[in-house]
From Swiss-Prot:
May serve as a molecular chaperone assisting in the proper folding of secreted and/or membrane proteins. Plays a role in non-neural cells nuclear envelope and endoplasmic reticulum integrity. May have a redundant function with TOR1A in non-neural tissues. It holds the Pfam family TOR1A_C. Residues 1-24 form the signal peptide. One of its GO terms (biological process) is nuclear membrane organization. Glycans are attached at residues 64, 165. It comes from the Eukaryota. GO terms for cellular component: endoplasmic reticulum; endoplasmic reticulum lumen; extracellular exosome; nuclear envelope; nuclear membrane. This is Torsin-1B. InterPro entries: P-loop_NTPase, TOR1A_C, Torsin, Torsin_1/2.
Length: 336
């Protein structure tokens, strides 16, 4: 916006100067100068008007850090690690005018813990239309890459899709869901785009964002959470350093992670492995209340309790964590 404003000012100044020196130049020269300045002003005005009615990729659009922080803190429950890491990673990346590589996040945890929800929050804070934006691209492994015998075809298609869309918008976001169901080797096709290259075939990928969502590593995360609970320590005491190293190694060695022996891990191209902790009873109740508010319903604590108690919890003896997180809250609330 600052650049556009400066250009408009420059164009206006050019018109003013052209008018004041009209007597000192030939009529044709003056006409050309005024015409050029008018063309610049007209283009900028057209571009501004166009972007009011159609989605434009505005690279200079700043990230509203306060709005992002509020969304994460008020809408994501029981995930203090994810909230902190994602906020710092995104704000740091977007505040860097010259990043050396794309931002790559790998989100891990059992179903219903908030991974997809966070990717939606991130998309909406980066592009106003969120997941509906032309600059946000969602890949679902079982839908887009179902056949193991077509790995080479998928790799070629993936490279072309990413190259074309980053060429159109440097700030593109790519989300890969169900990474644990992705055939090994497919994701390595994007390795050149995640590396520290200034350009690849004339295209810079340094301002793009890649997000991987996976259930892989959920068992490792749960074990750590349980160890803390059994030791009488709060879940909020769990730090990223308690999980990230174990998570990266575990995913690398897991044949069903989508990142098995992947060059993305081997070459340290994934910036953060972000654990999503299993949700407790109190977090499920938070999800029920949030869903009620989203539906415009008054909060009925009796219903909140009944829905939460209908969920199943594990381990068998302690019954601490919801085995489906908050995934079935919406459908269960329909019965009340």
């Amino acid at each position: 916006m600052l650049r556009a404003g400066w250009l408009r000012g420059a164009a206006a100044l050019a018109l003013l100067l052209a008018a004041r020196v009209v007597a000192a130049f030939e009529p044709i020269t003056v006409g050309l100068a005024i015409g050029a300045a008018s063309a610049i002003t007209g283009y900028l005005s057209y571009n501004d008007i166009y972007c009011r009615f159609a989605e434009c990729c505005r690279e200079e659009r700043p990230l509203n850090a306060s709005a992002l922080k509020l969304d994460l803190e008020e809408k994501l429950f029981g995930q203090h690690l994810a909230t902190e890491v994602i906020f710092k990673a995104l704000t740091g990346f977007r505040n860097n005018k010259n990043p050396k590589k794309p931002l790559t996040l790998s989100l891990h945890g059992w179903a219903g813990t908030g991974k997809n929800f966070v990717s939606q929050i991130v998309a909406e804070n980066l592009h106003p239309k969120g997941l509906k934006s032309n600059f946000v691209h969602l890949f679902v492994s079982t839908l887009h890459f179902p056949h193991e015998q077509k790995i080479k075809l998928y790799q070629d298609q993936l490279q072309k899709w990413i190259r074309g869309n980053v060429s159109a918008c440097a700030n593109s976001v790519f989300i890969f869901d169900e990474m644990d169901k992705l055939h090994p080797g497919i994701i390595d096709a994007i390795k050149p785009f995640l590396d520290y290259y200034e350009q690849v075939d004339g295209v810079s990928y340094r301002k793009a964002i890649f997000i991987f969502l996976s259930n892989a590593g959920g068992d490792l995360i749960t074990k750590t959470a349980l160890d803390f609970w059994r030791a009488g320590r709060k879940r909020e005491d769990i730090q990223l350093k308690d999980l990230e190293p174990v998570l990266s190694v575990g995913v690398f060695n897991n044949k069903h992670s989508g990142l098995w022996h992947s060059g993305l891990i081997d070459k340290n191209l994934i910036d953060y492995f972000i654990p999503f902790l299993p949700l407790e009873y109190r977090h499920v109740k938070m999800c029920v209340r949030a869903e009620m508010r989203a539906r415009g319903s008054a909060i009925d604590e009796d219903i909140v309790t009944r829905v939460a108690e209908e969920m199943t919890f594990f381990p068998r003896d302690e019954k601490i964590y919801s085995d489906k997180g908050c995934k079935t809250v919406q459908s269960r609330l329909d019965f009340h």
